[in-house]
Amino acid sequence: MQVSDFHFELPDELIARYPKAERTASRLLQLDGNSGQLVDGTFKDVLELVEPGDLLVFNNTRVIPARMFGRKASGGKLEVLVERMLDEHTILAHVRSSKPPKPGTELYLGENDEFHAVMQARHDALFEIRFTAETVVLDILNQIGHMPLPPYIDRPDEETDKERYQTVYNQKPGAVAAPTAGLHFDQALLEQIQAKGVELAYVTLHVGAGTFQPVRVENIHDHHMHAEYVEVPQEVVDAIAATKARGGRVVAVGTTSVRSLESAAQDALQKGTELKPFFGDTEIFIFPGYQYQLVDCLITNFHLPESTLIMLVSAFAGYEHTMAAYEHAVKEQYRFFSYGDAMFIRKQTTKA
């Protein structure tokens, strides 16, 4: 398949620049992967769509204020976007400046040069930067960092983004983009879902800035995914086994939860074992033809044209059904991307 197969026309005004006042106030488009049937509704419908015995799997990563502004010792301005923390004093980052800094370049980060750092090495498009202060990276980011809103939101970050570009159940700092399907859940909805007899479980995938990188090859089979760190702990493995045994469904909240679970499943397949805990980097790229091992339903936002995420959804619901659903969403003026509306998708189990 070609990247252009996943193109759709999106009017600029449908890109959500701000979240709705209430987390659960977004709209929800249901898609049945077998029939292709679409149902328009609101996010609170999730409470009716999940059933007792189901398992909801969330990504509990926490977005770090990963964008910093500063200058080189020579005076040139730069912007640093953390891709991942290598240790307590070293980061791997994207750097925007008039000229890429060479190894040994001294940097001053923060509006008032609060922190001194040295560019140590370049790894393809990324720069390894070490801070000289005793302060650990997370504390530095909390002092001078900005929330790394995606490029298409196209505005400076504001104080409210610190709360709203973050799930209510976040626990483990390390993401530079929010797992956006989770932004629709508030504490009250989570409690109502549990009261219904639905189990909740948490994986971790630290979303990298690479999630916004366009696919730069025409044939999707030639695309190579960026690596992201994943944790699928023992309690999730146990919860999945118990859910499947009782005939419940595994409902993944967000494409990052899908990629975490399916990474663990692929690891087990390759090793010829049953599902086991998985801790490590994943480069899993899911596109049509992929056989899902664990996930039965998916809650996800609307994704960018030609992105790896619309490919993942197409593999889940079927290509034709997915593209028809997106066409419907544009016609009905759903709000797109991180701060936009969501879908509830039942997996295609019979080929259309």
Swiss-Prot record:
Q: Which GO terms describe its biological process?
A: queuosine biosynthetic process; tRNA wobble guanine modification
Q: Which GO terms describe its molecular function?
A: S-adenosylmethionine:tRNA ribosyltransferase-isomerase activity
Reactions it catalyzes: 7-aminomethyl-7-carbaguanosine(34) in tRNA + S-adenosyl-L-methionine = epoxyqueuosine(34) in tRNA + adenine + L-methionine + 2 H(+)
Enzyme Commission code: 2.4.99.17
Q: Does Transferase count among this protein's keywords?
A: yes
Per UniProt, subunit arrangement is: Monomer.
| Protein known as | S-adenosylmethionine:tRNA ribosyltransferase-isomerase
Q: Which organism is it from?
A: Vibrio cholerae serotype O1 (strain ATCC 39541 / Classical Ogawa 395 / O395)
